[in-house]
Amino acid sequence: MGDPRRLGKKYDTPNHPWIGERIQKEREISHKYGLVNKKELWKMETQLRNYRRQARKLISDTTTQGGKEAVQLFNVLKRYAILVEQEPTLDHILSLNIESILERRLQTLVYRKGLAKTAKQARQLIVHGHIAVNGRRVTSPSYLVSVSENNAIGYVPNSPMALENHPERTTAVSEENQ
C-alpha cells in the first residue's frame, strides 16, 4: 500500500521522449482539443489503455464473472458515449481511439455546443466558473460528461455570461445561428 498523502500518477509518460512523429501527432491533437499540456493527453491515453487492457483480459476470461465484468465495462463506456454501438463487443473496445474519449470532455462539448468561440475560450469559461452541468458549477475542463448530462450544459445562472447582451455571448450565439 502506498502513502495516502502521496497519490500515484494517473498517467504514463511515453517510453522515448523525442520521437518526432509522436510529438507532431500530440501537438495536432492538443491544438484540436485545446489541451494545455501533454499531461492532459497522457491521462486520457492511459485511461484508454486501461479500458483496452481490461477488454483483452476479458476476451480470454470465459467464466460467468468475466461476462458480468464485460457488461459492466460496456455500461461504463456507453454511459459516457465513448462506445456508441448498439450491440458492443470487446473488439469494439479494442478499436477505440483517443479522440473518442477527448470528444466527451466538458471543454470539447462546450466548444461544440457553441457556448464558446474556440476550444481555448471554452477552457477559460470553465476554469473561471461560467459553465454549469445540471445546475452545478464545474471548473474542470477534463470533466467527462455522461450522456444524461449532455443536454444540461449551460451557463451558470449568476454568471455575467448568462446575460443575453454580453458581448462574448452574442458573438457565440450569432455564429451558431448562421
UniProtKB/Swiss-Prot annotation:
Protein name, UniProt field: Small ribosomal subunit protein uS4
GO cellular component: small ribosomal subunit
UniProt lineage: Archaea, Methanobacteriati, Methanobacteriota, Methanomada group, Methanococci
Gene Ontology molecular functions: rRNA binding; structural constituent of ribosome
Family note: Belongs to the universal ribosomal protein uS4 family.
Quaternary context: Part of the 30S ribosomal subunit. Contacts protein S5. The interaction surface between S4 and S5 is involved in control of translational fidelity.
Keywords: Ribonucleoprotein, Ribosomal protein, RNA-binding, rRNA-binding
Any GO BP annotation: ribosomal small subunit biogenesis
UniProt source species: Methanococcus vannielii (strain ATCC 35089 / DSM 1224 / JCM 13029 / OCM 148 / SB)
NCBIfam families linked to this entry: PRK04051.1, uS4_arch
Job of this protein: One of the primary rRNA binding proteins, it binds directly to 16S rRNA where it nucleates assembly of the body of the 30S subunit. With S5 and S12 plays an important role in translational accuracy.
